[in-house]
């Protein structure tokens, strides 16, 4: 009945179903007297057949200024040419099939054309209404299909109440399936909802909330819907599967739709704790960062992740960000806010329970998060845009008391120093400032003592602690258990002095080598002069100057020796170690060779 272009068709070229009908009583030789335009399609029809069923077309013809209306434009009819063809068939008495896919469009078209029972008994609107009630909305699957078909029929489908009826039916039947599943798998209905637009899906979720469905059932539906809708957005945790699109390119419309989708999903999340896996929340946050959603959306996700941060993995925290030219970076600010919110929550919980957060009373959750943070630092340590201040800012978010051992943090620091070999001594000290050398295990201290990348004071801390432990006679098994002696914590001021001594010794060693070379050059010059008397006097003078220089150096080194006469007195350890025998150290010199 429809053709493309502007050439109307004759009645003898109408569909075969029209020719087969037994209700067609007029001769097909009767010429058509009106052309109905629907978009680019033209329908050659008879006025009297259309007016008999459609009050809208009757009004158009009656109210027209032209005495003989030959063309009618119905481009605004819901459903377009395909649905109008079925409405025309109904006017001609031609049989056609009403299905769950087309019933909403047919009902909207019938209301648009005013093909109601008020105008004519047993009209098209009444037929579609009966089909909706008795067939389409009698099952969950049928109601979802009808609701899906309403997406292209807005706003008339909502104005006519079809959307509301479908949402109510879907919400009620989904709640019933969630509580009393009749099919396997039990969550089959969540898969059915995935075909809906996010706005209709939101309406269904709201309907289920009003009916008191369990939050866990809502969470299951939201997770399934999100995974289906955003499966191609972020394919892995690192963001390498993401194709960045500039807001000005051809994909901007799709990007905008995805942004709205993420923001709508986040607004639907129930507030109950523990409903959503942390990796799901982190995946949503990656999408939100990539799509540049609103600050409210990202803050909501960060808040939810911080509540369950003890269950997060390092991969979950690797949140990619992108520059305007598509370069992939890491969103360190989001991670910092998440960790900070978790620590603040733990602090408030500790104070509420009567604990003292500032004196080292940390929960198991906080200790677990500390290990995750250290592993995260080790993972991002090789990134070139990671500065010392950013590294320390993340490391210092976790209280030092939350780390029973600083081995993981030491590993992260070592990776950072290896990835940034051009740091000077002061910068390396800043990197290591977040670590406590006295909380390293025996193996870590052994590695640190031989690590040339570490600053001198860190190496000295490790060596001094081992010496103190050796003097106190503590067994090696206790060393590996990372038992920190209270006496070792009292020697921090002495360690600072040792660091200064070590640096001065290095300067003296350099000065000594210069003087040796100077004396050697003088001897060569005097031997080449040839005058024995002056040569002898020069040698005597040289010997005296050598003797005087080495004497002064030896005296100065003797003053700087931290172990001379047992200056590092550890006798006070006896008071707290319960009678542990500590032998007095032997006299020894501070070697400068």
From Swiss-Prot:
Keywords: Phosphoprotein, Transducer, Ubl conjugation pathway. GO terms for cellular component: cytoplasm; nucleus; peroxisome. GO terms for biological process: chloroplast accumulation movement; phototropism; protein ubiquitination; signal transduction. Transmembrane segments: none annotated. InterPro entries: BTB/POZ_dom, NPH3/RPT2-like, NPH3_dom, SKP1/BTB/POZ_sf. Residues 32-100 form the BTB domain. Residues 187-469 form the NPH3 domain. Pfam families: BTB, NPH3. SUPFAM superfamilies: POZ domain. Induction: Light fluence rate-dependent induction, independent of light quality. Up-regulated by blue light treatment. The modification Phosphotyrosine is found at residue 410. Belongs to the NPH3 family. Interacts with RPT3 and PHOT1. May act as a substrate-specific adapter of an E3 ubiquitin-protein ligase complex (CUL3-RBX1-BTB) which mediates the ubiquitination and subsequent proteasomal degradation of target proteins. Signal transducer of the phototropic response and photo-induced movements. Necessary for root phototropism. Involved in hypocotyl phototropism under high rate but not under low rate light. Regulates stomata opening. Seems to be not involved in chloroplast accumulation and translocation. The BTB/POZ domain mediates the interaction with some component of ubiquitin ligase complexes. This is Root phototropism protein 2. It comes from Arabidopsis thaliana (Mouse-ear cress). The lineage of its organism: Eukaryota, Viridiplantae, Streptophyta, Embryophyta, Tracheophyta.
